[in-house]
């Protein structure tokens, strides 16, 4: 039997989350790229903001989004967009490591839209809409060929559905997930391998 060494109350948990998040923000500037290694933090920071309503935390993610012009990978020509093999360049627009940033951009947009600023804030989700619409209406279903993509892009698809009302995002999520299951899901353990190479 596993027992926790300490019972935490709500205030203690909030205090610890605040302490850790404040430390992170004090020691890491937000002016960094929108790739997964930075973007994953912002998905958590947005959840902390939703819980605590601390404007300083929200401002940190806004500065990061503004630094990246509300984009992921920046290639403008869809004919040059790719998602494999692995790459960190501007042409990897369809690669989930460059799409996780859209989770935060959509969250930031929704905050503004709730204040009645939807039209004035459309720039926040313009690139997300462009990229994810393209992907949702494309034929491939093997976009998520490594397990991290499930955390990175599945939420983007559900957020895009909620943002637009277009069920194609849910259809694409389902189709992509079926392919992911085929290439990575271990049927005995019901756990995912790291990627399709295993």
Predicted regions and their residues:
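Well-ordered alpha-helical scaffold segments within catalytic/enzyme domains
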Residues: 2-6, 40-55, 100-117, 152-166
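Extracytoplasmic mature domains of secreted/periplasmic and thylakoid-lumen proteins
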Residues: 80-87, 91-158
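Long, well-ordered core segments of solenoidal/helical folds
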Residues: 11-31, 59-82, 119-141, 167-193
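Solvent-exposed loop and edge beta-strand segments that line ligand/cofactor-binding
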Residues: 9-10, 18-46, 50, 54, ...
């Amino acid at each position: 039997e596993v027992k926790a060494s300490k019972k935490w109350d709500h205030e203690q948990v909030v205090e610890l989350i605040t302490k850790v998040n404040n430390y992170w923000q004090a020691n890491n500037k937000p002016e960094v790229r929108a790739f997964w290694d930075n973007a994953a933090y912002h998905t958590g920071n947005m959840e902390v903001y939703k819980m605590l309503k601390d404007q300083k935390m929200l401002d940190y993610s806004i500065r990061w989004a503004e630094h990246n012009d509300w984009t992921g990978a920046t290639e403008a020509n869809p004919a040059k967009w790719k998602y494999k093999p692995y790459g960190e360049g501007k042409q990897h627009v369809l690669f989930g490591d460059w799409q996780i940033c859209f989770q935060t951009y959509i969250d930031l947009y929704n905050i503004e839209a709730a204040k009645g600023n939807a039209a004035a804030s459309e720039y926040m989700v313009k690139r997300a809409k462009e990229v994810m619409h393209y992907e949702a209406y494309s034929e491939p279903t093997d976009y998520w060929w490594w397990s991290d993509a499930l955390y990175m892009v599945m939420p983007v698809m559900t957020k895009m559905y909620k943002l637009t009302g277009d069920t194609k995002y849910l259809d694409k999520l389902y189709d992509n997930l079926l392919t992911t299951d085929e290439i990575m899901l271990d049927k005995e353990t019901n756990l995912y391998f790291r990627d399709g190479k295993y």
